[in-house]
């Protein structure tokens, strides 16, 4: 039987990795071994940062809500507690959006929270 050298398969594998490494800096988009390492790292970074993104956005929303709440004479925790007592279910993303884009509506929510807190 003739020996099969697998050139087509190897080339296909290398081509796939180098295609994924397109746009990388320096040798990382040219040399197969370094490109392969960088692609593996890139997969790791992507996996990690998909989770990190959720934390980052939550932190951003809380910061924005806190700033707007303090402009209305409440702290973040007081506002959230007051909203819970007033049975107003609005998530942090929506609250942050109101704080940035619709100050009047946010003030109305803050006033409702203040009323339930007895302030």
UniProtKB/Swiss-Prot annotation:
InterPro entries reported for this sequence: Ribosomal_bL20, RIBOSOMAL_L20_CS, Ribosomal_protein_bL20_C
Matching Gene3D superfamilies: 6.10.160.10, Ribosomal protein L20
Molecular-function GO terms, alphabetical: rRNA binding; structural constituent of ribosome
Pfam families reported in the protein's UniProt record: Ribosomal_L20 (PF00453)
Keyword check for RNA-binding: yes
Gene Ontology cellular component list: ribonucleoprotein complex; ribosome
Transmembrane segments: none
Record carries keyword Cytoplasm: no
GO biological process: ribosomal large subunit assembly; translation
Coiled coil: none
Key words, A-Z: Ribonucleoprotein, Ribosomal protein, RNA-binding, rRNA-binding
Top-rank taxon: Bacteria
HAMAP family xref list: Ribosomal_bL20
NCBIfam families in the cross-refs: rplT_bact
Family: Belongs to the bacterial ribosomal protein bL20 family.
Biological role: Binds directly to 23S ribosomal RNA and is necessary for the in vitro assembly process of the 50S ribosomal subunit. It is not involved in the protein synthesizing functions of that subunit.
Annotated protein name in UniProt: Large ribosomal subunit protein bL20
Organism: Streptococcus pneumoniae serotype 4 (strain ATCC BAA-334 / TIGR4)
Gene, per the UniProt record: rplT
């Amino acid at each position: 039987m003739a020996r099969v050298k697998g050139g087509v398969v190897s080339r296909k594998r290398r081509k796939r990795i180098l295609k994924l490494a397109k746009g990388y800096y320096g040798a990382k988009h040219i040399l197969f071994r370094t490109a392969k390492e960088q692609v593996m790292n890139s997969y790791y970074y992507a996996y990690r940062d998909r989770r990190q993104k959720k934390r980052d956005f939550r932190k951003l929303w809380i910061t924005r809500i806190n700033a707007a709440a303090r402009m209305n004479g409440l702290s973040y925790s007081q506002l959230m507690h007051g909203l819970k007592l007033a049975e107003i279910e609005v998530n942090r993303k929506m609250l942050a959006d109101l704080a940035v884009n619709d100050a009047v509506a946010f003030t109305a929510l803050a006033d409702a929270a203040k009323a339930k807190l007895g302030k």
